[in-house]
Design a protein with these regions (language model features):
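Short beta-alpha junctions and helix-cap segments that line functional grooves
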Residues: 244-245, 317, 411-412
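Conserved SAM/AdoMet-binding glycine-rich loop
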Residues: 76-80, 85, 90, 187-312, ...
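Conserved, mostly hydrophobic/aromatic
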Residues: 158, 178, 195, 232, ...
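Extended hydrophobic-aromatic, low-complexity segments
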Residues: 256-257, 270-271, 282, 294-297, ...
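Proteins enriched for Cys/Gly/acidic motifs involved in redox and nucleic-acid/cofactor modification
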Residues: 1-203, 243, 254, 258, ...
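Generic beta-strand/beta-sheet core signal
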Residues: 7, 196-198, 233-235, 261-263, ...
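Conserved beta-strand core positions
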Residues: 4, 41-42, 146, 193, ...
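Terminal RNA-binding accessory module
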Residues: 336, 344-443
Length: 443
């Protein structure tokens, strides 16, 4: 049996794919290495979504190739979106790579590894539209929180996005399969479950009944013992209906936090980018959400420099950001992706787009500072994530913060805390976008 190392790049959905491959490898009797040095095969599960992700993936491949040249690792197998996107080009441009699997071939990870170990190259690209095969996972997040992917692929076909070409059409997992996995995760210590897909709001709409099943799924997840927080990401504005709002508002386990990617607010740009809905829909939705779900934290993503964005359209976006005061915003520079309709459209100057993204970040920074200042004096429930040796402090997150992408709460405590503890923290300060406070018994 062999020792297999894994590197997972990109989003949480990619991480789940990697965890499933790890499970298959272990089930076949191989050992999953904690690092990569000493591995007989290194699997690099890549992201190829935008230019920066492609560059990161290539850097990791080259770094691993350097270790291979030194004899510190054996074979290199590249999987994920970069391999799906560039296929044979990877082997041609990087001969150090021994094999590639597309996004439709994750289930073939074990035979691919065994083929590599027998001295053969591997190239396998299965159908990206095939139903996902259910399997276990080797969870790589801290024990107390886990991601659960409820669907694969995307059928939205936004003009700027390459994902449907890499991941195939939208395919929901069966509800019972999702619930079974969630129960296993909870039994193994998961307290915060983070629901992800390319578009969680369309869960179930590809089944014969064409019914939105996210509300039903969330209600069933709330019945699982051990789960304390359930967080929902990637909900599209045109699919948020009253039933979903009612479930989020009424279920105590569902944190009052929604990740709603809007990308822009200008009607002309939304139409050109093949986004359903318009500015009026978004504004009315946000107003309804704020009214129906008190304390709701809205996260979104915005893209600066989309084709057709002149100064007038950009200023409209800035004003929208100031008026809507979304608590969490990721601002990105438009990246023209070959093979997408937007790549052939007239582009905004790259430097102008970069400056616009920085402007959005500055506006949002002020909004976040004001939001954080408003938390001072409040006692908030915080999930402890760990201890920072350098800061000599525990840290965690409130319901307003998703792992890795949002802020932290620095916790002063006279008693030792443990990862996965829920504690009440009275906020007494703000530090570089994070909150700070002390443990209190106050509810």
């Amino acid at each position: 049996m062999a020792t297999i190392g894994f590197i997972s790049l990109g989003c949480a959905k990619n991480q789940v794919d990697c965890e499933r491959m790890m499970f298959r490898v272990q089930e076949a009797g191989h050992t999953v290495n904690e690092g990569i040095v000493g591995s007989d095969v290194v699997v690099i599960n890549t992201c190829g979504f935008i230019d920066s992700a492609k560059s990161e993936a290539i850097d990791y491949i080259l770094q691993t190739a350097a270790l291979k040249a030194e004899g510190q690792v054996g074979k290199i197998l590249v999987t994920g979106c970069l391999s799906q996107r560039y296929q044979g080009d990877i082997l041609q441009e990087m001969p150090e790579v021994d094999g590639i699997l597309g996004t439709g071939s994750y289930t073939k990870i074990v035979p691919a590894i065994e083929q590599l170990l027998s001295g053969h190259k591997v190239v396998d690209f299965g159908s990206i539209d095939a139903p996902e095969e259910e399997t276990g996972r080797v969870v790589t997040t801290p024990e107390h929180f886990s991601y659960i992917k409820i669907a694969e692929g995307c059928s939205n076909r936004c003009a700027f996005c390459i994902i449907p070409y890499l991941r195939g059409k939208y395919r929901s997992r069966q509800l019972d399969d999702v619930l079974y996995e969630a129960r296993v995760l909870a039994a193994n210590g998961t307290k915060e479950l983070i629901v992800v897909a390319q578009d969680t709001s369309r869960y179930g709409t590809d089944f014969p009944e064409h019914k939105r099943l996210l509300p039903e799924l969330l209600r069933e997840l709330c019945k699982i013992d051990g789960l304390h927080w359930i967080r929902v990401h990637y909900v599209y504005p045109d699919e948020i209906d009253d039933e979903l709002i009612d479930v989020i508002a009424s279920e105590p386990k569902i944190v009052k936090y929604l990740d709603i990617p809007i990308q822009h607010c200008n009607d002309k740009i939304l139409s050109t980018m093949h986004r359903r809905g318009d500015k009026k829909l978004i504004e009315e939705l946000f107003a309804k959400l704020r009214t129906r779900i008190p304390g709701l934290v809205i996260r979104t993503s915005l893209i600066a420099g989309l084709p057709g964005e002149g100064e007038e359209e950009f200023q409209e976006l800035c004003q929208f950001l100031r008026e809507q005061r979304m608590e969490r915003v990721g601002a990105f520079v438009f990246s023209p992706e070959e093979g997408t309709p937007a790549a052939t459209m007239e582009h905004v100057d790259e430097e102008v787009a970069r400056e616009r993204a920085q402007t959005l970040e500055m506006i949002q920074s002020q909004i976040m500072d004001e939001y954080n200042a408003a938390q001072i004096g409040k006692t908030l429930e915080v999930l402890v994530d760990g201890y920072d040796e350098e800061q000599e402090q525990f840290y965690g997150r409130t319901y307003a913060d998703s792992p890795d992408i949002d802020g932290r709460v620095w916790i002063a405590s006279e008693e030792p805390l443990h990862e996965g503890d829920f504690v009440n923290v009275t906020i007494d300060g703000c530090i570089d976008g994070d909150l700070a406070g002390y443990v209190t018994e106050e509810e």
